[in-house]
Amino acid sequence: MPKVAIYNVSGQQVSEIELSENVFGVEVNEHAMYEVVKNQLANRRQGTQSAKTRAEVRGGGRKPWKQKGTGRARVGSIRSPLWVGGGIVFAPKPRDYSYTIPKKVRRLALKSALTSKVNSNELIVLDELKLDAPKTKEMVNILKNLNVDKKALIVMGEKSEAVIKSANNIQGVQTALVNTINVYDILKYDKLIITKDAVQKVEEVYA
């Protein structure tokens, strides 16, 4: 079982925790992570793009000039895609980009993402993370104590408005509840800061 240190908000190691081999010690499957990230990004697309074909552009029903005898190129409509103001060839239309992938693949991808953070020493476990009131300065100091100077995702076991509001004002820092974590966010941020109770909940669900 992978073993990592547990820190307090002052950056001091207070104990150690043995992580579940089935969650934080699996063989990293990069293809599964790729498929899930691609799926997440596709599902986020609005798909509202739209343009008109030559049949949908208003006007252009009359032939601009006669077919022969003018010396000019033959034209059937001023709404031809070749003309300014004409229709669009294969014009994009609103569509739904979302699709589903097997639950087994999603679980494997999440475990792979968590394991990759452990393998690259980018996982920080906190004994607890509590703030009496929203204070950005206090959150900045906590990150400084943990030597976090890059993008970080903070995962909590229980919702804390004080923590969320304190982190919202810090560029490159995002908070998430343990039941909302996903592969894209885990890989997007350089550091994964997770509370001890959140680790236990992750292992309960995915072990």
From Swiss-Prot:
Q: What is the lineage of its organism?
A: Bacteria, Bacillati, Bacillota, Clostridia, Peptostreptococcales
Family listed: Belongs to the universal ribosomal protein uL4 family.
One example of the protein's molecular function in GO is: structural constituent of ribosome
Q: Which GO terms describe its biological process?
A: translation
Does the record's keyword annotation contain Transport? no
Task: List all Basic residues biased stretches.
Answer: 60-71
Protein name, UniProt field: Large ribosomal subunit protein uL4
Annotated organism of origin: Alkaliphilus oremlandii (strain OhILAs)
NCBIfam families documented for this protein: rplD_bact
Q: Where is this region: Disordered?
A: 44-71
Q: Where is the signal peptide?
A: none
Task: Give the encoding gene's name.
Answer: rplD
Query: Keyword set for this entry?
Result: Ribonucleoprotein, Ribosomal protein, RNA-binding, rRNA-binding
The protein's job, in short, is: One of the primary rRNA binding proteins, this protein initially binds near the 5'-end of the 23S rRNA. It is important during the early stages of 50S assembly. It makes multiple contacts with different domains of the 23S rRNA in the assembled 50S subunit and ribosome.
Pfam families linked to this entry: Ribosomal_L4 (PF00573)
Its GO CC terms are: ribonucleoprotein complex; ribosome
Quaternary organization: Part of the 50S ribosomal subunit.
